Amino acid sequence: MPHDLTAQDVKRIREKYGLTQQGFARLLGLGEASVVRYENGQKPSKANANLIRAADDPAFMKGCLERDGELLSAGQREKTEKIVYALISFDEDGDVMDINEMYEITLQQEVLIGQI
């Protein structure tokens, strides 16, 4: 069973992408006040905790940006996209992926998104 999501976890995940509380909330479809409360120690619902945990995965955030990136300011979106793409360009071992590995992952994501 995964540990409870702490206020520090929420803030760490948000800051990992250089997002404001408002930007993080918009990309995940949460209320800004909810993100503030979670970062101040209130426990999120199970559904929101799972959503925030999923946001720790750069590939998940890439999908959020593609779907709802227009909800961010142009500067915030550009900054976050650069961070996400930089995080995605490394594999699980921290090694730089070659273009073929990145292409394969992109194709897999497109297939998964198409099935949703």
Q: Which residue stretches match the model-derived regions?
A:
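Short functional hotspots where side chains directly engage DNA or cofactors
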Residues: L51
